[in-house]
Protein backbone atom coordinates (compact mmCIF):
# COMPACT_ATOMS: atom_id res chain seq x y z
CA UNK A 1 0.00 0.00 0.00
CA UNK A 2 1.26 3.46 -0.93
CA UNK A 3 1.15 5.95 1.97
CA UNK A 4 1.21 9.70 1.26
CA UNK A 5 2.96 12.36 3.32
CA UNK A 6 3.29 11.62 7.04
CA UNK A 7 0.94 8.62 6.91
CA UNK A 8 2.45 5.51 8.47
CA UNK A 9 1.72 2.57 10.76
CA UNK A 10 2.51 3.31 14.42
CA UNK A 11 3.70 1.07 17.25
CA UNK A 12 0.09 0.09 18.04
CA UNK A 13 -0.30 -1.24 14.52
CA UNK A 14 -2.73 1.57 13.70
CA UNK A 15 -2.68 4.01 10.83
CA UNK A 16 -1.18 7.33 11.86
CA UNK A 17 -1.34 10.70 10.09
CA UNK A 18 0.52 13.81 11.18
CA UNK A 19 1.73 11.97 14.25
CA UNK A 20 -1.84 11.25 15.39
CA UNK A 21 -3.43 7.80 15.68
CA UNK A 22 -6.42 7.63 13.31
CA UNK A 23 -8.32 5.30 15.63
CA UNK A 24 -8.04 7.91 18.36
CA UNK A 25 -9.22 10.54 15.87
CA UNK A 26 -12.29 8.46 15.04
CA UNK A 27 -13.04 7.99 18.74
CA UNK A 28 -12.59 11.68 19.55
CA UNK A 29 -14.33 13.30 16.58
CA UNK A 30 -16.60 10.55 15.26
CA UNK A 31 -17.01 9.25 11.73
CA UNK A 32 -17.18 9.92 8.85
CA UNK A 33 -14.25 12.26 9.38
CA UNK A 34 -12.11 14.21 6.93
CA UNK A 35 -8.48 14.25 8.11
CA UNK A 36 -5.89 16.57 6.52
CA UNK A 37 -2.11 16.14 6.69
CA UNK A 38 -1.01 19.77 7.06
CA UNK A 39 2.68 19.02 6.55
CA UNK A 40 1.93 17.49 3.16
CA UNK A 41 -0.12 20.52 2.09
CA UNK A 42 2.80 22.75 3.02
CA UNK A 43 5.19 20.50 1.07
CA UNK A 44 2.99 20.60 -2.03
CA UNK A 45 2.64 24.40 -1.91
CA UNK A 46 6.38 24.89 -1.53
CA UNK A 47 7.04 22.52 -4.42
CA UNK A 48 5.41 25.01 -6.79
CA UNK A 49 6.59 28.24 -5.17
CA UNK A 50 10.20 27.20 -4.69
CA UNK A 51 10.56 26.17 -8.33
CA UNK A 52 9.46 29.60 -9.55
CA UNK A 53 11.88 31.20 -7.08
CA UNK A 54 14.75 28.97 -8.27
CA UNK A 55 14.02 29.93 -11.88
CA UNK A 56 13.90 33.63 -11.00
CA UNK A 57 10.41 33.98 -12.47
CA UNK A 58 7.91 36.50 -11.18
CA UNK A 59 4.84 34.43 -10.44
CA UNK A 60 1.76 33.86 -8.33
CA UNK A 61 0.73 30.40 -7.16
CA UNK A 62 -2.99 30.74 -6.46
CA UNK A 63 -4.67 28.00 -4.45
CA UNK A 64 -7.82 26.94 -6.32
CA UNK A 65 -10.04 26.92 -3.27
CA UNK A 66 -12.96 25.11 -4.91
CA UNK A 67 -10.98 21.93 -4.17
CA UNK A 68 -11.38 22.50 -0.43
CA UNK A 69 -12.56 25.82 0.98
CA UNK A 70 -12.60 26.45 4.72
CA UNK A 71 -11.35 29.34 6.82
CA UNK A 72 -8.51 27.20 8.19
CA UNK A 73 -7.40 26.06 4.74
CA UNK A 74 -7.41 29.60 3.37
CA UNK A 75 -5.38 30.79 6.34
CA UNK A 76 -2.92 27.96 5.68
CA UNK A 77 -2.66 29.09 2.05
CA UNK A 78 -1.81 32.59 3.27
CA UNK A 79 0.83 31.20 5.64
CA UNK A 80 2.49 29.53 2.65
CA UNK A 81 2.51 32.74 0.62
CA UNK A 82 -0.10 31.65 -1.90
CA UNK A 83 -2.65 33.74 -3.76
CA UNK A 84 -6.26 32.56 -3.87
CA UNK A 85 -8.65 31.53 -6.64
CA UNK A 86 -12.35 31.74 -5.75
CA UNK A 87 -15.32 30.86 -7.97
CA UNK A 88 -18.37 32.12 -6.08
CA UNK A 89 -19.59 34.70 -3.63
CA UNK A 90 -19.52 32.00 -0.96
CA UNK A 91 -15.85 31.23 -1.54
CA UNK A 92 -15.06 34.94 -1.64
CA UNK A 93 -16.91 35.46 1.63
CA UNK A 94 -14.96 32.59 3.22
CA UNK A 95 -11.72 34.24 2.11
CA UNK A 96 -12.80 37.55 3.62
CA UNK A 97 -13.75 35.89 6.91
CA UNK A 98 -10.34 34.19 6.92
CA UNK A 99 -8.68 37.59 6.60
CA UNK A 100 -6.97 36.67 3.34
CA UNK A 101 -5.23 39.64 1.63
CA UNK A 102 -7.78 40.92 -0.89
CA UNK A 103 -5.16 42.03 -3.41
CA UNK A 104 -4.17 38.36 -3.83
CA UNK A 105 -7.69 37.09 -4.57
CA UNK A 106 -8.67 36.15 -8.14
CA UNK A 107 -12.40 35.74 -8.82
CA UNK A 108 -13.42 33.13 -11.43
CA UNK A 109 -16.78 31.79 -12.59
CA UNK A 110 -18.83 31.62 -15.78
CA UNK A 111 -21.98 33.27 -14.39
CA UNK A 112 -21.08 35.72 -11.64
CA UNK A 113 -24.11 37.59 -10.36
CA UNK A 114 -24.34 41.35 -9.94
CA UNK A 115 -24.26 40.86 -6.16
CA UNK A 116 -21.10 38.75 -6.38
CA UNK A 117 -19.35 41.27 -8.61
CA UNK A 118 -20.41 44.12 -6.34
CA UNK A 119 -18.91 42.25 -3.38
CA UNK A 120 -15.65 41.75 -5.27
CA UNK A 121 -15.49 45.41 -6.31
CA UNK A 122 -16.45 46.68 -2.86
CA UNK A 123 -13.52 44.79 -1.33
CA UNK A 124 -11.16 45.75 -4.17
CA UNK A 125 -9.94 42.22 -4.84
CA UNK A 126 -6.84 41.72 -6.95
CA UNK A 127 -8.40 40.49 -10.16
CA UNK A 128 -11.65 39.38 -11.78
CA UNK A 129 -11.29 36.67 -14.42
CA UNK A 130 -13.87 37.62 -17.05
CA UNK A 131 -15.57 34.69 -18.73
CA UNK A 132 -18.04 36.17 -21.25
CA UNK A 133 -19.41 39.34 -22.86
CA UNK A 134 -22.34 39.61 -20.44
CA UNK A 135 -19.93 39.71 -17.51
CA UNK A 136 -17.68 42.21 -19.23
CA UNK A 137 -20.64 44.55 -19.75
CA UNK A 138 -21.87 44.01 -16.19
CA UNK A 139 -18.49 44.84 -14.66
CA UNK A 140 -18.22 47.99 -16.76
CA UNK A 141 -21.74 49.04 -15.74
CA UNK A 142 -21.17 48.47 -12.01
CA UNK A 143 -17.80 50.22 -12.09
CA UNK A 144 -19.38 53.17 -13.88
CA UNK A 145 -22.17 53.40 -11.28
CA UNK A 146 -19.73 53.23 -8.38
CA UNK A 147 -16.92 55.16 -10.09
CA UNK A 148 -14.34 52.46 -9.38
CA UNK A 149 -11.80 50.58 -11.48
CA UNK A 150 -10.72 46.96 -11.41
CA UNK A 151 -8.13 44.59 -12.84
CA UNK A 152 -9.28 41.77 -15.08
CA UNK A 153 -7.98 38.76 -16.95
CA UNK A 154 -9.80 37.46 -20.00
CA UNK A 155 -10.43 33.73 -19.84
CA UNK A 156 -9.80 32.15 -23.23
CA UNK A 157 -10.36 28.65 -24.58
CA UNK A 158 -7.31 27.68 -26.63
CA UNK A 159 -8.88 24.60 -28.24
CA UNK A 160 -6.72 22.12 -26.34
CA UNK A 161 -8.27 18.88 -25.10
CA UNK A 162 -6.40 17.54 -22.09
CA UNK A 163 -6.43 13.80 -21.45
CA UNK A 164 -8.93 13.66 -18.61
CA UNK A 165 -12.60 12.98 -17.81
CA UNK A 166 -15.13 14.73 -20.08
CA UNK A 167 -16.74 16.52 -17.13
CA UNK A 168 -13.45 18.18 -16.17
CA UNK A 169 -12.33 19.24 -19.64
CA UNK A 170 -12.44 23.01 -19.89
CA UNK A 171 -9.95 24.22 -22.49
CA UNK A 172 -11.48 22.80 -25.67
CA UNK A 173 -13.56 24.99 -27.98
CA UNK A 174 -16.89 23.36 -27.08
CA UNK A 175 -16.94 24.50 -23.45
CA UNK A 176 -19.16 26.66 -21.26
CA UNK A 177 -16.07 28.57 -20.14
CA UNK A 178 -14.26 31.51 -21.67
CA UNK A 179 -13.84 33.41 -24.93
CA UNK A 180 -12.92 31.30 -27.93
CA UNK A 181 -9.39 32.08 -29.05
CA UNK A 182 -9.80 30.86 -32.62
CA UNK A 183 -13.08 32.39 -33.81
CA UNK A 184 -12.36 36.00 -32.84
CA UNK A 185 -14.38 36.17 -29.62
CA UNK A 186 -11.31 36.68 -27.45
CA UNK A 187 -9.99 39.52 -29.61
CA UNK A 188 -13.40 41.20 -29.64
CA UNK A 189 -13.53 40.99 -25.83
CA UNK A 190 -10.04 42.45 -25.60
CA UNK A 191 -11.01 45.38 -27.83
CA UNK A 192 -14.07 46.11 -25.69
CA UNK A 193 -12.05 45.92 -22.48
CA UNK A 194 -9.25 48.11 -23.81
CA UNK A 195 -11.81 50.79 -24.68
CA UNK A 196 -13.29 50.76 -21.17
CA UNK A 197 -12.46 53.50 -18.69
CA UNK A 198 -12.98 51.16 -15.77
CA UNK A 199 -11.00 47.96 -16.34
CA UNK A 200 -7.32 47.23 -16.79
CA UNK A 201 -6.65 44.07 -18.77
CA UNK A 202 -3.75 42.49 -16.93
CA UNK A 203 -3.65 39.57 -19.33
CA UNK A 204 -5.26 36.27 -20.26
CA UNK A 205 -6.19 33.07 -18.48
CA UNK A 206 -6.82 29.53 -19.62
CA UNK A 207 -7.53 26.23 -17.89
CA UNK A 208 -7.35 23.11 -20.03
CA UNK A 209 -8.69 20.51 -17.62
CA UNK A 210 -7.95 18.59 -14.47
CA UNK A 211 -6.05 15.52 -13.29
CA UNK A 212 -3.47 15.94 -16.09
CA UNK A 213 -0.32 13.80 -15.96
CA UNK A 214 1.96 15.42 -18.52
CA UNK A 215 2.91 18.88 -19.72
CA UNK A 216 1.94 18.50 -23.38
CA UNK A 217 -1.41 20.25 -23.01
CA UNK A 218 0.08 23.18 -21.10
CA UNK A 219 2.85 23.61 -23.69
CA UNK A 220 0.36 23.53 -26.59
CA UNK A 221 -1.95 25.97 -24.80
CA UNK A 222 0.93 28.40 -24.29
CA UNK A 223 1.83 28.18 -27.99
CA UNK A 224 -1.75 28.82 -29.10
CA UNK A 225 -2.07 31.79 -26.77
CA UNK A 226 1.20 33.36 -27.86
CA UNK A 227 0.21 33.06 -31.52
CA UNK A 228 -2.76 35.29 -30.70
CA UNK A 229 -0.76 37.55 -28.42
CA UNK A 230 1.59 38.28 -31.31
CA UNK A 231 -1.40 39.23 -33.49
CA UNK A 232 -2.79 41.43 -30.70
CA UNK A 233 0.58 43.08 -30.27
CA UNK A 234 0.69 43.95 -33.97
CA UNK A 235 -2.97 44.97 -34.37
CA UNK A 236 -3.85 46.40 -30.97
CA UNK A 237 -0.44 47.28 -29.49
CA UNK A 238 -1.32 45.08 -26.54
CA UNK A 239 1.04 42.91 -24.51
CA UNK A 240 -0.09 41.12 -21.34
CA UNK A 241 1.43 41.75 -17.95
CA UNK A 242 0.07 38.38 -16.76
CA UNK A 243 -0.31 34.94 -18.32
CA UNK A 244 -2.38 32.57 -16.18
CA UNK A 245 -2.16 28.95 -17.35
CA UNK A 246 -4.55 27.60 -14.73
CA UNK A 247 -4.17 24.32 -12.90
CA UNK A 248 -5.17 20.72 -13.43
CA UNK A 249 -1.98 19.08 -12.20
CA UNK A 250 -2.67 15.40 -11.53
CA UNK A 251 -2.21 13.39 -8.34
CA UNK A 252 -1.92 9.71 -7.50
CA UNK A 253 -5.24 8.21 -6.43
CA UNK A 254 -4.35 4.62 -7.28
CA UNK A 255 -1.44 2.72 -8.80
CA UNK A 256 -2.97 3.45 -12.23
CA UNK A 257 -2.02 7.13 -11.85
CA UNK A 258 1.48 8.38 -12.64
CA UNK A 259 1.78 12.08 -11.76
CA UNK A 260 4.90 14.15 -12.33
CA UNK A 261 6.51 16.48 -9.76
CA UNK A 262 5.33 20.07 -9.42
CA UNK A 263 8.80 21.23 -10.39
CA UNK A 264 8.55 19.47 -13.75
CA UNK A 265 5.25 21.14 -14.60
CA UNK A 266 6.66 24.55 -13.72
CA UNK A 267 9.99 24.11 -15.50
CA UNK A 268 8.47 22.88 -18.76
CA UNK A 269 5.79 25.57 -18.76
CA UNK A 270 8.37 28.31 -18.14
CA UNK A 271 10.69 26.86 -20.78
CA UNK A 272 7.91 27.08 -23.37
CA UNK A 273 6.85 30.59 -22.35
CA UNK A 274 10.45 31.78 -22.65
CA UNK A 275 10.67 30.27 -26.15
CA UNK A 276 7.50 32.06 -27.23
CA UNK A 277 8.54 35.38 -25.69
CA UNK A 278 11.85 35.18 -27.53
CA UNK A 279 10.30 34.09 -30.83
CA UNK A 280 7.82 36.97 -30.87
CA UNK A 281 10.07 39.62 -29.25
CA UNK A 282 7.66 40.14 -26.37
CA UNK A 283 8.10 41.03 -22.73
CA UNK A 284 8.11 38.19 -20.22
CA UNK A 285 4.72 38.24 -18.45
CA UNK A 286 4.21 37.38 -14.81
CA UNK A 287 3.11 33.73 -14.68
CA UNK A 288 0.15 32.63 -12.58
CA UNK A 289 -0.91 29.04 -11.95
CA UNK A 290 -3.83 27.62 -9.95
CA UNK A 291 -3.15 24.29 -8.21
CA UNK A 292 -6.03 22.97 -6.15
CA UNK A 293 -6.29 19.19 -6.13
CA UNK A 294 -2.49 18.95 -6.38
CA UNK A 295 -2.13 20.85 -3.08
CA UNK A 296 -4.76 19.11 -0.97
CA UNK A 297 -5.90 15.95 -2.76
CA UNK A 298 -3.46 13.40 -1.40
CA UNK A 299 -3.27 15.21 1.95
CA UNK A 300 -6.84 14.20 2.78
CA UNK A 301 -8.04 10.88 4.21
CA UNK A 302 -11.62 10.03 5.14
CA UNK A 303 -12.30 7.75 8.10
CA UNK A 304 -15.46 5.63 8.12
CA UNK A 305 -16.87 3.11 10.56
CA UNK A 306 -17.81 -0.22 9.06
CA UNK A 307 -21.35 -1.39 9.69
CA UNK A 308 -23.33 -4.05 7.88
CA UNK A 309 -22.19 -6.69 5.44
CA UNK A 310 -23.91 -8.54 2.61
CA UNK A 311 -22.41 -11.63 1.00
CA UNK A 312 -23.73 -12.73 -2.38
CA UNK A 313 -22.27 -16.22 -2.89
CA UNK A 314 -20.00 -16.48 -5.94
CA UNK A 315 -20.80 -12.88 -6.87
CA UNK A 316 -19.67 -10.18 -4.42
CA UNK A 317 -19.08 -9.23 -0.79
CA UNK A 318 -20.57 -5.85 0.14
CA UNK A 319 -19.24 -3.98 3.18
CA UNK A 320 -21.18 -0.86 4.19
CA UNK A 321 -19.78 2.24 5.89
CA UNK A 322 -21.41 5.14 7.71
CA UNK A 323 -20.86 7.62 4.87
CA UNK A 324 -20.96 7.52 1.10
CA UNK A 325 -22.00 9.77 -1.74
CA UNK A 326 -23.13 12.42 0.75
CA UNK A 327 -19.48 13.01 1.73
CA UNK A 328 -17.77 11.80 -1.48
CA UNK A 329 -19.84 11.98 -4.63
CA UNK A 330 -16.86 11.61 -6.98
CA UNK A 331 -17.19 7.82 -7.49
CA UNK A 332 -20.81 8.26 -8.58
CA UNK A 333 -20.11 11.41 -10.61
CA UNK A 334 -16.79 10.58 -12.27
CA UNK A 335 -16.31 6.86 -11.58
CA UNK A 336 -13.39 8.01 -9.43
CA UNK A 337 -11.20 5.31 -7.92
CA UNK A 338 -9.62 5.20 -4.47
CA UNK A 339 -7.40 3.02 -2.32
CA UNK A 340 -8.20 2.20 1.31
CA UNK A 341 -7.07 0.18 4.34
CA UNK A 342 -8.53 -0.81 7.66
CA UNK A 343 -6.99 1.82 9.93
CA UNK A 344 -7.03 -0.49 12.97
CA UNK A 345 -5.12 -3.24 11.09
CA UNK A 346 -3.49 -1.68 8.01
CA UNK A 347 -0.74 -4.30 7.70
CA UNK A 348 -3.00 -7.33 8.03
CA UNK A 349 -2.97 -9.62 5.02
CA UNK A 350 -5.81 -9.07 2.56
CA UNK A 351 -7.74 -12.33 2.45
CA UNK A 352 -10.88 -11.25 0.62
CA UNK A 353 -12.10 -8.80 -2.00
CA UNK A 354 -14.99 -6.58 -0.99
CA UNK A 355 -16.91 -3.64 -2.42
CA UNK A 356 -17.44 -0.64 -0.16
CA UNK A 357 -21.06 0.52 -0.13
CA UNK A 358 -22.25 3.88 1.10
CA UNK A 359 -25.29 4.27 3.34
CA UNK A 360 -27.36 6.40 0.99
CA UNK A 361 -30.57 4.93 -0.39
CA UNK A 362 -29.15 4.84 -3.90
CA UNK A 363 -27.85 1.81 -5.80
CA UNK A 364 -25.06 3.94 -7.26
CA UNK A 365 -23.71 4.84 -3.82
CA UNK A 366 -20.57 2.71 -4.05
CA UNK A 367 -17.29 4.19 -2.83
CA UNK A 368 -14.88 1.46 -3.97
CA UNK A 369 -15.40 -1.66 -6.07
CA UNK A 370 -13.35 -4.83 -5.56
CA UNK A 371 -11.04 -3.71 -2.77
CA UNK A 372 -8.63 -6.29 -1.30
CA UNK A 373 -8.98 -6.21 2.52
CA UNK A 374 -8.44 -8.39 5.56
CA UNK A 375 -11.69 -9.64 7.11
CA UNK A 376 -13.67 -6.47 7.80
CA UNK A 377 -15.75 -6.55 10.96
CA UNK A 378 -18.43 -4.21 12.23
CA UNK A 379 -16.88 -1.18 14.01
CA UNK A 380 -13.56 -1.48 12.15
CA UNK A 381 -12.35 1.87 10.80
CA UNK A 382 -11.85 2.20 7.05
CA UNK A 383 -9.39 4.86 5.87
CA UNK A 384 -9.94 6.00 2.29
CA UNK A 385 -6.95 7.88 0.90
CA UNK A 386 -6.67 10.94 -1.34
CA UNK A 387 -10.06 12.44 -0.49
CA UNK A 388 -8.69 15.93 0.20
CA UNK A 389 -10.01 17.52 -2.99
CA UNK A 390 -13.70 17.73 -3.90
CA UNK A 391 -14.83 15.60 -0.98
CA UNK A 392 -15.79 18.17 1.64
CA UNK A 393 -16.37 20.83 -1.02
CA UNK A 394 -18.90 18.65 -2.89
CA UNK A 395 -20.48 17.16 0.24
CA UNK A 396 -24.25 17.30 0.44
CA UNK A 397 -27.21 16.43 2.64
CA UNK A 398 -28.70 13.72 0.45
CA UNK A 399 -31.04 11.56 2.55
CA UNK A 400 -30.72 14.38 5.13
CA UNK A 401 -27.35 12.98 6.19
CA UNK A 402 -25.35 15.65 8.10
CA UNK A 403 -21.97 16.67 6.71
CA UNK A 404 -18.86 15.29 8.47
CA UNK A 405 -16.35 17.19 10.58
CA UNK A 406 -12.91 18.21 9.30
CA UNK A 407 -9.71 17.85 11.30
CA UNK A 408 -6.18 19.13 10.61
CA UNK A 409 -3.28 17.08 11.98
CA UNK A 410 0.33 18.21 12.31
CA UNK A 411 3.25 17.39 14.61
CA UNK A 412 1.23 15.04 16.79
CA UNK A 413 -1.64 17.49 17.33
CA UNK A 414 -5.17 17.53 15.94
CA UNK A 415 -7.33 20.59 15.41
CA UNK A 416 -11.03 20.61 14.62
CA UNK A 417 -11.49 23.09 11.75
CA UNK A 418 -15.08 22.30 10.72
CA UNK A 419 -17.65 21.05 13.20
CA UNK A 420 -19.83 18.09 12.34
CA UNK A 421 -23.31 19.09 11.21
CA UNK A 422 -26.13 17.59 13.23
CA UNK A 423 -29.72 16.83 12.33
CA UNK A 424 -30.98 19.88 14.18
CA UNK A 425 -28.59 22.21 12.30
CA UNK A 426 -29.30 20.50 8.98
CA UNK A 427 -33.01 21.22 9.47
CA UNK A 428 -32.64 24.71 10.95
CA UNK A 429 -33.22 26.53 7.67
CA UNK A 430 -36.41 24.67 6.75
CA UNK A 431 -39.55 26.83 6.87
CA UNK A 432 -42.63 25.10 8.26
Curated annotation (Swiss-Prot):
Sorted alphabetically, which PANTHER family does this protein's record hold? DIAMINOPIMELATE DECARBOXYLASE, GROUP IV DECARBOXYLASE
The reaction(s) this protein catalyses:
meso-2,6-diaminopimelate + H(+) = L-lysine + CO2
The cofactors required by this protein are: pyridoxal 5'-phosphate
What the entry lists under PROSITE patterns is as follows: ODR_DC_2_1 (PS00878), ODR_DC_2_2 (PS00879)
- The name under which this protein is listed is Diaminopimelate decarboxylase
State where pyridoxal 5'-phosphate binds: 248, 290-293, 390
Q: What does the record note on quaternary structure?
A: Homodimer.
Q: Tell me the route in metabolism or biology where this protein functions.
A: Amino-acid biosynthesis; L-lysine biosynthesis via DAP pathway; L-lysine from DL-2,6-diaminopimelate: step 1/1
Q: Which residues cross the membrane?
A: none
Positions annotated to bind substrate? 293, 330, 334, 362, 390
Question: Keywords in UniProt for this one?
Answer: Amino-acid biosynthesis, Decarboxylase, Lyase, Lysine biosynthesis, Pyridoxal phosphate
Report the source organism. Answer: Bacillus methanolicus
Give the protein family. Belongs to the Orn/Lys/Arg decarboxylase class-II family. LysA subfamily.
Query: A biological process (GO) annotation for this entry?
Result: lysine biosynthetic process via diaminopimelate
Described purpose of this protein according to its UniProt entry: Specifically catalyzes the decarboxylation of meso-diaminopimelate (meso-DAP) to L-lysine.
Q: Which residues carry this modification: N6-(pyridoxal phosphate)lysine?
A: 66
User: Could you say which EC number(s) this protein's record lists?
Assistant: 4.1.1.20
Question: Where is the catalytic site?
Answer: 361
- Mind listing the GO molecular function terms for this protein? diaminopimelate decarboxylase activity; pyridoxal phosphate binding
